[in-house]
Each structure stands twice: as C-alpha cells, then as structure tokens.
Amino acid sequence: MAGAKKKIIGCAAVLEEMLPLLPSDLAYEILDFGLHFRPSNLKSALQKAIDASARDVDTIILGYGLCSNGAVGLKAPKTATLVIPKVHDCIALFLGSHESYKQQLKAEAGTFFLAKGFIEVGDTPLDEYKRTVERYGKERADRVMRTMFGHYTRVLFINTGHQDLSKCHEHSRQMAQQFGLRYEETKGSRVFLEKMIRGPWDREFILVKPDETVTIEQFLKQT
C-alpha cells in the first residue's frame, strides 16, 4: 500500500493537528466537528464522503476512531481500502497511542482532555458554557455545567508540539478555573498521526478491504 494514492477524511479537530504533517500532494477533506454529537449523522456524512472519494483514490484514511459507534457500519467502496485508527476517540491520536490514553485515565479517571484541535474549532465546554450564559443566563449555565462536570477533577492539555500555544493555554486554564478543576499539561506525540499518514498501518489500525463493512468487533480486538 506504500504507493497507493491516498486521501484523508477527518474531523476538524484531528485535521487541525495533522495539517502541519501532511505532504503537499496528499488530498484531505474536513468534516464538521459537530457531527460527533449526532453519531447517525456522522456515519451518513462519512459514508457520503467515502463514496465520493472512491473514484479518485485507492486508500482512504479516516481521521476518526470509533467515535460513539459513528464508524460502525461504514462500507469500503468496491475500489478502495479504508484505514481507520483502532481507537475509541481522537484523544489517543494526540497522546501517541491507545496505551498512553489508558495510562492517563488510570492515573486520574476524572480527566477532561483538551488539545489545540478542539480549541481551534471552537467547541469546548468553555465555549458551550459561554453560549449557554448568553442564551439562558449565568445561573442556569452554572447549574448545567455543575451537573456535567461533577465527576471531573482536572483539565489536561495535550501539547503536540505546535509553535504558538498561548491561546490554547489560556483557554485551558480558563476552563479549569471556571469549572473548579485542576489544570495540567502533558506532552503529546505525533507518532500516531504520522503513522496514519505514512504507515506502517500495523495492529493499531483497522484495514477494511474493498466492499467490506466496519464492525464493532474490529475496534474491540486487542492491539
């Protein structure tokens, strides 16, 4: 597959992290981050993008994981292979591996993860809080967020090596302060993102052959 003509289809948060790594001749398509909140819509949007891309490439790399089962049921075109990282969500992509993700959650289960991609697309809980204040008032917004964040203890910003992160640091600290959480930063890794682009597509990936369908079991198999 090394010489295959490839295309990446991913959500805005993942592509924000990947763009500095992409070769100039590698095609990509960005889908709306908001689709994550409607898995059935995510699935249909992904399938539509996959089908539309099939005539131009023979390998389609998805910048998505399981994502609330949004990837389950996707069908590879008759002429192209799908490559999907074997992760439940994109946090593992920013930390470098699914194992690193599990280690962070084991260290502190009440962790809310942030990365540049999430902040740049403007869809973090702090953004949602501000919108709720504008629409319903501070009292109701505070009540809603207390319910949502009652089990969280820290905000962990994943630094994947971008040059200017001042805006991201400020946003992450503000979010931690607003919701009464501890703020921490950890060093991320671009290893997984690099492997998505260039390979090798090893046991950390799901390869869906032409005309085959993605199953939940493929994500549950141990890497």
Where are these regions (language model features)?
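N-terminal basic/disordered segments at the start of proteins
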Residues: M1-S24
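Gly/Ser/Thr-rich loops at beta-strand to alpha-helix junctions
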Residues: I9-E16, L35-H36, I60-V72, H88-D89, ...
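A short beta-strand-loop structural module common to alpha/beta enzyme folds
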Residues: L26-N41, E185-K187
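Glycine-rich, highly charged phosphate/nucleotide-binding loops
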Residues: P39-A52
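Extended, charge-rich low-complexity interaction segments
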Residues: V57-I61, G65-L66, G70-G73, F113-Y129, ...
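Long, charge-dense
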Residues: K75-L126
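Active-site rim beta-loop-alpha module in soluble metabolic enzymes
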Residues: G110-M175
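C-terminal accessory domains and tails appended to enzymatic cores
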Residues: E184-T223
